[in-house]
């Protein structure tokens, strides 16, 4: 397992098997987090860092969501493995859904994890960019005690985690501010791939009804909730998360 450059975009990769692409959330790349290593036991996993995040360049070329989709389309096509299984978390979930809608030939199965991308008047999302660290931890985690361990999971250098995160958030505002709604709801019906909508029950950033809204708009989708988890079920409930993903990707 290693990290390697993909042009200007850093990519974590590991494992062998069916190709699996993982798109991370708005705060930071997960590095070699435990859930990625577990997925790499049965899949050839690639987890690119979003352009402009951490050590990856290329953000200046992204004018809108369409440019993001084209960036990932190029990465998948350069991989040369045919359609991939695609997992997107948080903001990465929004981008994964866009890819599946606009490039359906590239996606075999789709997993959306606590995904952004919709706006529900009855269930508004808080603005994570103005929340205090304590408020953000309470919103993100079922057990806020996980917040103290998060940099060790998500950042290669915990001492630099706050600086890296600040820069990442500045980039995320392009797609999430004032709200993370760029018209995705109109495109979700064009997704052909079987879709699993995974959602941590205690998520205080993306309320649980958003999961049902995704499933209503995607033709072949179902919802699975994960108790004891908030916005990061792959961290708080790693084994439950990986088990749910594996059952969906390899049914039978």
Please provide the spans of the model-predicted regions:
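Conserved HGGG/HGGXW glycine-rich cap/lid loop of the alpha/beta-hydrolase fold
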Residues: 7-55
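Conserved alpha/beta-hydrolase catalytic His-Asp/Glu region
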Residues: 121-127, 134-192
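Gly/Ala-rich beta-loop-alpha elbow adjacent to hydrolase catalytic centers
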Residues: 88, 92, 96
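Short beta-strand/loop motif that positions the catalytic acidic residue
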Residues: 191, 197-199
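Catalytic active-site module of serine/aspartate enzymes centered on a nucleophile-bearing elbow/loop
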Residues: 221-252
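Flexible "cap/lid" loop of the alpha/beta hydrolase fold
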Residues: 97-102, 108-139
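Active-site loop/oxyanion-hole signature of alpha/beta-hydrolase fold enzymes
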Residues: 46-87, 243
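Acidic catalytic loop of the alpha/beta-hydrolase fold
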Residues: 202-206
């Amino acid at each position: 397992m290693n990290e390697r450059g993909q042009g200007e975009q850093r990519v974590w990769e590991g494992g062998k098997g069916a190709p699996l692409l993982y798109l991370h959330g708005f705060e930071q790349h997960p590095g070699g987090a435990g859930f990625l290593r577990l997925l790499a036991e049965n899949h050839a996993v690639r987890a690119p860092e979003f352009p402009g995040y951490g050590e990856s360049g290329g953000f200046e070329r992204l004018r809108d969501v369409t440019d993001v989709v084209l960036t990932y389309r190029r990465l998948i096509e350069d991989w040369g493995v045919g359609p991939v299984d695609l997992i997107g978390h948080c903001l990465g979930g929004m981008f994964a859904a866009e890819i599946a809608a606009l490039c359906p030939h590239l996606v075999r199965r789709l997993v959306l994890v606590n995904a952004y991308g919709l706006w529900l008047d009855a269930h508004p999302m808080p603005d994570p960019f103005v929340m205090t660290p304590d408020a953000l931890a309470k919103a993100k985690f079922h057990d806020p005690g996980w917040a103290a361990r998060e940099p060790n999971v998500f950042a290669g250098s915990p001492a630099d985690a706050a600086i890296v995160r600040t820069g990442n958030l500045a980039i995320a505002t392009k797609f999430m501010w004032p709200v993370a709604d760029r018209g995705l709801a109109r495109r979700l019906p064009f997704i052909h791939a079987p879709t699993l909508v995974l959602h941590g029950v205690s998520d205080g950033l993306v309320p649980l009804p958003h999961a049902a809204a995704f499933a209503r708009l995607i033709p072949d989708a179902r919802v699975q909730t994960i108790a004891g988890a908030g916005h990061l079920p792959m961290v708080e409930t790693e084994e439950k998360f990986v088990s749910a993903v594996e059952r969906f990707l390899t049914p039978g």
